[in-house]
Structures are given as C-alpha cells and as structure tokens.
C-alpha cells in the first residue's frame, strides 16, 4: 500500500511509532533523519536537523554489544488532530522505555513521559515539524545513558 493510500492519521501514527523502532534498533542515522527539517526539544535544549539529533543521541545513549540500546519504547495514548486544509497536525502521546541488559540489568522501566508533536504535510507525505520530549520519571539508567554508570 502506498503512503498516499494511508489516511493522514495513520501516516502520522506510523511516524510516531517509527521513531521508537529506529531508536530501539540503534539506527541513529535514520532516527535523526526523521527530523531533517524539524525541531527536537528536550528540556531547555532545542536542536534542528537530523545530524544534530543523531549526534546528540549518539553522545548520550549507551549502545550495547549487539549494536542496540537494548530498549523497547512503548508509545501509547496517541491522540492525533489533523488539519487537512492547512496540511498540519498535532499529536500527544505517552511513552515508557523498557530495558534489559543480560547479566547487568533485569527487565524494567527505565523512563517514561510524554511527547508533544507537530507535523506538516510536504509533497503529499507527513513529516515531523517539532517533537517536544518530557521526562516524567526515570528508573535505573546506568545502562541506558552514558555517564550514569557507577564505579
């Protein structure tokens, strides 16, 4: 099925979920490319463009021997509001990050929060225009974020 055959809601939901899949796979280049023409807001930090986001994630995320962060981002409660006339949309969702690291960390939730997104339609396809990431809680991030490992 071509992208244009999918409803706007479905195309946008696919972008939201693709973000999780690419991050969990450790595919930082394609992860960053989701934001080639978009802002990525994390706390006080605002970055624009895929390479800047790829570099940020690469500098903060622990990548394990299998080439992944050994995580599963679970995105839920997705609420999408589309303005077809103006080719724009907004979405809100919640996320939880599960992680396990064999012999290091049992399966657990290492973080959770909210995404607030804006999308724009260009060339008959939907793209991120802005993603704001809010962290509401964290767990044991020693094997998820660089600089968190204890001695």
Regions found by a protein language model. Name each.
Residues 1-33:
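Short, low-complexity N-terminal intrinsically disordered segments enriched in polar/charged residues
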Residues 10, 71, 108-110:
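Transmembrane beta-barrel outer-membrane domains
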Residues 23, 35-36, 95-97, 132-135:
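Short beta-strand segments enriched in hydrophobic/aromatic residues
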Residues 28-96:
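A solvent-exposed, acidic/Ser-Thr-rich amphipathic alpha-helical stretch
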Residues 88-90, 112-143:
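Short beta-strand edge/turn micro-motifs at domain boundaries
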Residues 95-99, 119-121:
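Beta-strand elements of well-folded, non-transmembrane domains
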Residues 98-108, 138-139:
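Short, cysteine-centered beta-strand-loop-beta hairpins and adjacent loop/turn segments enriched
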Residues 141-151:
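Extended, polar beta-sheet/loop recognition surfaces of beta-rich domains
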């Amino acid at each position: 099925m071509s992208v244009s055959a999918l409803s706007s809601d479905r195309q946008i939901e696919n972008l939201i979920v693709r973000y999780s899949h690419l991050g969990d796979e450790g595919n930082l280049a394609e992860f960053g490319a989701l934001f080639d023409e978009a802002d990525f807001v994390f706390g006080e930090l605002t970055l624009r463009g895929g390479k800047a986001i790829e570099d940020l994630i690469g500098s903060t995320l622990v990548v394990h021997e299998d080439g992944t962060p050994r995580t599963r981002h679970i995105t839920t409660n997705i609420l999408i509001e589309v303005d077809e006339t103006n080719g724009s949309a907004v979405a809100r969702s919640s996320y939880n990050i599960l992680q396990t690291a064999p012999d290091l960390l049992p399966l657990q939730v290492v973080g959770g929060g909210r995404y607030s997104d804006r999308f724009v339609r260009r060339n008959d396809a939907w793209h991120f225009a802005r993603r704001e990431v809010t962290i509401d809680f964290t767990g044991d991030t020693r094997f998820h974020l660089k600089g968190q490992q204890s001695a």
